[in-house]
């Protein structure tokens, strides 16, 4: 069955999960933020976040779809496309 989340709900969930995972206030994150810069994370930490997001949304994101993705909005749209 197709997931009925809206794009905005997916973005909100991505931001909430990232904030909780990295213990930063949710209000410090916005959809167009570069998560590497905003969260001050490296590629291994980003991979950990991606794994958690895949588990939460029950999706698998191929590496080629994530190349060059660094903002929450684009990441959420890639997730949304797989729901």
Residue ranges of model-derived segments:
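Phosphopantetheine-dependent thiolation modules in NRPS/PKS and related acyl-activating systems
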Residues: 2-41, 50, 55-56, 60-83
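Two-component histidine kinase catalytic core, primarily the HATPase_c
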Residues: 45
